[in-house]
Amino acid sequence: MTTMGTPLTPNATKVMMLGSGELGKEVVIELQRLGVEVIAVDRYANAPAQQVAHRAYTISMLDDDALRAVVEQEKPDFIVPEVEAIATETLVELEQKGYQVVPTAKATQLTMNREGIRRLAAEELGLPTSPYRFVDNFADFQQAVLAVGVPCVVKPIMSSSGHGQSIIKSLDQIQQAWDYSQAGGRAGGGRVIVEGFIKFDYEITLLTVRHINGTSFLAPIGHRQQNGDYRESWQPQAMSEVALQKAQQIAERITTALGGRGIFGVELFVCGDDIIFNEVSPRPHDTGMVTMASQELSQFALHARAILGLPIPHIEQFGPAASKAIVVEGKSNNVMFVGLDKVLEERGTHIRLFGKAEVNGHRRLGVILARDESTDKALAKVERAYANLTVKL
């Protein structure tokens, strides 16, 4: 029988979020609904999840000593990484000391960089993937591009939201792609993956939740990206039953190998009835924000239940839904949103503003959500709502 304490008392059940972005913010809200005391950590102050947590710390999570110190000070029942840029060796050490890392320190370590997870998927599990090479210098990079062939995709082994990613369509773009990859990695310049370009019909995120009752799959999520970063998503993505079964088999194999409990964002390419593994993140996925409109239990609520060992007997879908990211470009520390009344005037439309105070370049500041009779109608609805929004920088 699961027992929960009360926040801010000696018997509190404590969760520490490592990374406090918009996805972490929704997880914090769901945890607090279940009576959990939450501590939010990030590299900058007043990050979205820190705004709704009981306490917050601002440290470099790549600093072993700083990370260890904040964990040992708070002594959380669960440590929940929300980003890749974390000193994972310290998480392994803390797990060995008895701290519970979600889903596991191994999963966090393997998925923090593309090399670990690609070698697990392709070389250990034998899952279908694109052809690839890993390199850490320009000379080897040139050879890798020639070996894989053009077009090909270049990604730093540690990056997110499309940072440092590019497509090489001709050999005269090799230097430009290398320079961009070295500027975009989470831990600075370094190792990259060169991937063969897959001619896929579409790509999906198959959110997979490992919990005390077993493994459950959410309806597949389709999405559109721009420069490697999510812009729109919809659920469900129509696909054949054969392809869906293959996708679920791949998702179950990779998440079982990673272990632990929680939600996993499994990224897959769909080519007819064939499925090709792309990546997996052991945490909520940005494309999964659509589940805040499409499901009774969003990916964040499911993650919270799985972390705490609470049952997930059924995942009910309300119907077709879509999401559209609110992305701006510029520089400001005084962001304002104009026209929210117009955004929300249509039935079944919702908005989430993340509370990010500063913009310096491209930044995702919120998301618009909608339900309708079909995903096409839901997408049209979020587009109409988006057109009514003005962001002043």
Curated annotation (Swiss-Prot):
Family statement drawn from the similarity comment of this UniProt entry: Belongs to the PurK/PurT family.
Residues at which Mg(2+) binds: E267, E279
One Gene Ontology CC term in the entry: cytosol
Subunit-level organization: Homodimer.
Lineage of producing organism: Bacteria, Pseudomonadati, Pseudomonadota, Gammaproteobacteria, Pasteurellales
Origin species: Haemophilus ducreyi (strain 35000HP / ATCC 700724)
Enzyme class: ligase
GO biological process, one term: 'de novo' IMP biosynthetic process
Catalytic function, reaction form: N(1)-(5-phospho-beta-D-ribosyl)glycinamide + formate + ATP = N(2)-formyl-N(1)-(5-phospho-beta-D-ribosyl)glycinamide + ADP + phosphate + H(+)
Signal sequence coordinates: none
Record EC number: 6.3.1.21
UniProt pathway: Purine metabolism; IMP biosynthesis via de novo pathway; N(2)-formyl-N(1)-(5-phospho-D-ribosyl)glycinamide from N(1)-(5-phospho-D-ribosyl)glycinamide (formate route): step 1/1
Positions bound to N(1)-(5-phospho-beta-D-ribosyl)glycinamide: E22, L23, E82, D286, K356, R363, R364
InterPro entries per record: ATP-grasp, ATP-grasp_carboxylate-amine, ATP_grasp_subdomain_1, PreATP-grasp_dom_sf, PurT, PurT/PurK_preATP-grasp, PurT_C, Rudment_hybrid_motif
Domain ATP-grasp: 119-308
GO terms for MF: ATP binding; magnesium ion binding; phosphoribosylglycinamide formyltransferase 2 activity; phosphoribosylglycinamide formyltransferase activity
Binding-site list for ATP: R114, K155, S160, S161, G162, H163, G164, Q165, E195, G196, F197, I198, E203
Pfam families hit by this protein: ATP-grasp, PurT_C, RS_preATP-grasp-like
PANTHER family: FORMATE-DEPENDENT PHOSPHORIBOSYLGLYCINAMIDE FORMYLTRANSFERASE
Function: Involved in the de novo purine biosynthesis. Catalyzes the transfer of formate to 5-phospho-ribosyl-glycinamide (GAR), producing 5-phospho-ribosyl-N-formylglycinamide (FGAR). Formate is provided by PurU via hydrolysis of 10-formyl-tetrahydrofolate.
Protein's name according to its UniProt entry: Formate-dependent phosphoribosylglycinamide formyltransferase
Keywords per UniProt: ATP-binding, Ligase, Magnesium, Metal-binding, Nucleotide-binding, Purine biosynthesis
